[in-house]
């Protein structure tokens, strides 16, 4: 299946902010590290029939480059150093790093190459896959249906929050990777801009064009890669946390907690890390249980939780965000990142549950265990056992 009308992507910045934040850190600290990443469809969708159309889009991505106005805008942000931006200016996607195949109906994608380059593929490639699939499956759906669905949800949201002080409710768009389309995401974000509690987007292209704050710090791959970069597996998570602070000592300080598990993370997150990092991000497991653990941990360390921020981003919708806000708002600062339930929330459209995750670093296995068993990713069961032993984790979960 080929012949999609035009390139899905129009900007190198049409990606999540944390990709550029991590890429700069990799550029400065791990320039020669090699990685492999693989696509996973967590649902039962057979997407192999779209392999040729995806390949066309991958090949078209080599023509994307940082435009002068984009370069100038990035230069005005506090996150980036000149040497990195000069390098990014010359960056081009290399389609040879991407292998796309149809394996009896199953879509297989494997990415290999220098981490500093491979890191850029994940988010735009997932957005491409999502948009292509929805284009073929739901050709009559689009912006109008998405906007109608959002307006209906906002009416419910207003009723749900009528008795609440919403002055500390902060919502972000995290919807790039599984969006229905680029146009739908832009329309949804522009509508949300009218709400006082909407604070930004993870999409750098939208942030630039709509004058929004770009939101994001680091992803699982930052911690996964350190499982092989660090000489000692048991201290690899601490090495990842320290390296991030080395790159960003005073900003972008929200740490992702579930690459191993929340309990293993908190054992590594001592008073020095907890003091320097501005907060934590939840991405798997029970959110209330996680939040209670985070608050108790700060209190145990003598840190006032109200000086820290908890970011919730796992399978959220507006109703779940309000429930969490009710539970935690008086005890800690809060932000909520909603993705699929904003940018692919259309009646009769089934969002894709798709990911691309790191599987190797410097030719050796890495793993994500998480606080949700179904999210465990690793080929090498022996490495998963070693990882669990290194982090003193009791039960064994199946590696997928």
UniProtKB/Swiss-Prot annotation:
It catalyses: nicotinate + 5-phospho-alpha-D-ribose 1-diphosphate + ATP + H2O = nicotinate beta-D-ribonucleotide + ADP + phosphate + diphosphate. Keywords: Ligase, Phosphoprotein, Pyridine nucleotide biosynthesis. It comes from the Bacteria. GO terms for biological process: NAD biosynthetic process via the salvage pathway. Pathway: Cofactor biosynthesis; NAD(+) biosynthesis; nicotinate D-ribonucleotide from nicotinate: step 1/1. Its EC number is 6.3.4.21. Transiently phosphorylated on a His residue during the reaction cycle. Phosphorylation strongly increases the affinity for substrates and increases the rate of nicotinate D-ribonucleotide production. Dephosphorylation regenerates the low-affinity form of the enzyme, leading to product release. GO terms for cellular component: cytosol. This is Nicotinate phosphoribosyltransferase. Gene3D superfamilies: nicotinate phosphoribosyltransferase. Disulfide bonds: none annotated. It holds the Pfam family NAPRTase_N. HAMAP family: NAPRTase. Coiled coil: none annotated. Belongs to the NAPRTase family. The keyword Phosphoprotein applies. InterPro entries: N/Namide_PRibTrfase (IPR041525), NAPRTase_N (IPR040727), Nic_PRibTrfase (IPR006406), Nic_PRibTrfase-Fam (IPR007229), Nicotinate_pribotase-like_C (IPR036068). GO terms for molecular function: nicotinate phosphoribosyltransferase activity. The modification Phosphohistidine is found at residue 220. The keyword Cell membrane does not apply. Catalyzes the synthesis of beta-nicotinate D-ribonucleotide from nicotinate and 5-phospho-D-ribose 1-phosphate at the expense of ATP.
């Amino acid at each position: 299946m080929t012949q999609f009308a035009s390139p899905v992507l129009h900007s190198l910045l049409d990606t999540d902010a944390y990709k550029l934040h991590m890429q700069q850190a990799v550029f400065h600290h791990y320039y020669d590290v090699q990685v492999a990443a693989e696509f996973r469809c967590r649902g039962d969708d057979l997407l192999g029939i779209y392999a040729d159309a995806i390949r066309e889009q991958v090949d078209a991505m080599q023509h994307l480059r940082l435009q002068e106005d984009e370069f100038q805008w990035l230069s005005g942000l506090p996150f980036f150093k000149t040497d990195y931006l000069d390098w990014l200016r010359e960056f081009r996607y290399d389609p040879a790093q991407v292998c796309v195949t149809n394996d009896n109906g199953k879509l297989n994608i494997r990415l290999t190459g220098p981490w500093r380059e491979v890191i850029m593929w994940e988010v735009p490639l997932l957005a491409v896959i999502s948009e292509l699939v929805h284009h073929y499956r739901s050709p009559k759906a689009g912006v109008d249906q998405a906007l109608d669905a959002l307006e209906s949800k906002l009416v419910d949201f207003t009723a749900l929050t009528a008795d609440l002080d919403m002055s500390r409710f902060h919502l972000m768009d995290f919807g790039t990777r599984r969006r229905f389309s680029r146009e739908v995401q832009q329309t949804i974000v522009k509508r949300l801009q009218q709400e006082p509690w909407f604070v930004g987007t993870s999409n750098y292209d939208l942030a630039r064009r709509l004058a929004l704050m770009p939101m994001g710090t680091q992803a699982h791959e930052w911690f996964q890669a350190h499982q092989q970069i660090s000489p000692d597996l048991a201290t690899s998570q601490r090495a990842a946390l320290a390296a991030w602070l080395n790159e960003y000592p005073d900003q972008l300080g929200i740490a992702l907690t579930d690459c191993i598990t929340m309990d293993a993370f908190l054992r590594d997150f001592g008073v020095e890390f907890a003091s320097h990092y501005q907060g934590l991000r939840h991405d798997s497991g029970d959110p209330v249980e996680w939040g209670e653990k985070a608050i108790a941990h700060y209190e145990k360390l003598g840190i006032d939780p109200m000086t820290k921020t908890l970011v919730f981003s796992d399978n959220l919708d507006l109703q779940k965000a309000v429930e969490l806000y009710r539970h935690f708002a008086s005890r800690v600062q809060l932000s909520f990142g909603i993705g699929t339930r904003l940018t692919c929330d259309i009646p009769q459209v089934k969002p894709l549950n798709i990911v691309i995750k790191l599987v190797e670093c410097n030719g050796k296995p890495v793993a994500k265990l998480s606080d949700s068993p179904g999210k465990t990713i690793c080929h090498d069961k022996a490495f998963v056992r070693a990882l669990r032993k290194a982090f003193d984790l009791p039960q064994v979960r199946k590696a997928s």
